[in-house]
Amino acid sequence: MDNSFDIYEIKARQVLDSRGNPTIEAEVLTAGRGYGHAIVPSGASTGTFEAVELRDLGKKYGGKGVLNAVGNVNEIIAPELIGEDSRNQRLIDNIMINLDGTENKANLGANAILAVSMAVARAAADTSSLPLYKYLGGCNSYIMPVPMMNVLNGGKHAGNALDFQEFMIMPIGADSFSDAVRMCAETYQSLKKVISEKYGKDAVNIGDEGGFAPPVKTIDEAFSVLLEGVKRAGYENEIVFTLDSAASEFYDEKTNSYVVLGESLSTDKLIEIYKDMVSKYPIVSIEDPLFEGDFEGFKEITKELKGIQIIGDDIFVTNTNRLKKGIEMNAANALLLKVNQIGTISESIDAANLASRNGYGVIVSHRSGETEDSIISDLTVALNSGQIKTGAPARGERTAKYNQLIRIEEELQISKYAGKNFKIPF
């Protein structure tokens, strides 16, 4: 009997994310000397229904320490998983879910559980002498995703007047992933020059995800700057736009309205603004256009904006129960997949498969508080998702994901870039 895949050791520690806040890292070693490690990211604009990220709430690190989560791995999770076959990902994830005993992983912490879940997958892949994307996805994993690169920041990711959180570019006209990265990087540098000329050298500040955060005051002004950057780079026919509104962040539950640039708007009025934007600019996708609890509103905007990808992030939180409700109602037509919203690799894959089976697009995503861990790069190829959202072509925690995808594309030799078929790439 081959016991080389059996888990031999698990340990966790507190490390830092890209915002200088603590997060948790886990390491897993198998009997066959397979090694896996993982570092968990953290969000700024988080959905109400996300799994719970356990924080210490003590004096150190302003209450954001994760030593309790680290202790939960070392003292509770590890003893239960030692000796388990690392290939049994679903069994291992279920053991941790049952150990926690809550629907939202509030006892042990989704950050503790996810760190181990990801590290186990890596350890099993290493023991198998397989790259992680091939271990998770098999021989049919060959589609390289279209990157959604965040180049202009607003909302919680910046300090300007923009309420909408992310203005992104998608190089759907590229021939390969590496070509797509080049187009975006060139556009990013072009945009930097445009911003510097228009607002001054001090205006090329960047937000949490590497995008610029110039002092733009209106949505039209933001798109005007973006268009000029793309034009100067020479990619007007290759690059389109996508928007993350993060609308729950500017929604007022007391008045059931959205406060945009100081004006109070109804759901219908906000939808009209989106329709106007789509008519004026090459926008192909909008994420979280409305409040996270408004399934009816998502149904309406999906119907009104035919041909536009409407992505559910905060409304679905990578949770199959919430996604099923959306599918039944035709609310949105794509899922933003964030592994730390749900807390295990198995549940993340379940959500992606549910979305794909029902014709929903899948966008594998980072968080604003990221790390050098590039597991989402392998995951997007494993799932053939066709889309990845992981920030600007800047800051090491963002470029780590793009660089890993460049390596994967080179290793695959025969791959397919999703391009214009980004929503349903296979």
UniProtKB/Swiss-Prot annotation:
A GO CC term assigned to this protein in UniProt: phosphopyruvate hydratase complex
Location (main, coarse): cytoplasm
Residues that coordinate or bind (2R)-2-phosphoglycerate: 165, 338, 367-368, 389
Coiled-coil positions: none
Keywords: Cytoplasm, Glycolysis, Lyase, Magnesium, Metal-binding, Secreted
Pathway as given in its UniProt record: Carbohydrate degradation; glycolysis; pyruvate from D-glyceraldehyde 3-phosphate: step 4/5
Superkingdom of the organism of origin: Archaea
EC number(s) stated in the UniProt entry for this protein: 4.2.1.11
Enzyme active site: 209 (proton donor), 338 (proton acceptor)
GO biological process, one term: glycolytic process
Annotated catalysed reactions: (2R)-2-phosphoglycerate = phosphoenolpyruvate + H2O
Localization per Swiss-Prot or TrEMBL: Cytoplasm; Secreted; Cell surface
Function, in words: Catalyzes the reversible conversion of 2-phosphoglycerate (2-PG) into phosphoenolpyruvate (PEP). It is essential for the degradation of carbohydrates via glycolysis.
Protein name per UniProt: Enolase
Species, as recorded: Methanococcus vannielii (strain ATCC 35089 / DSM 1224 / JCM 13029 / OCM 148 / SB)
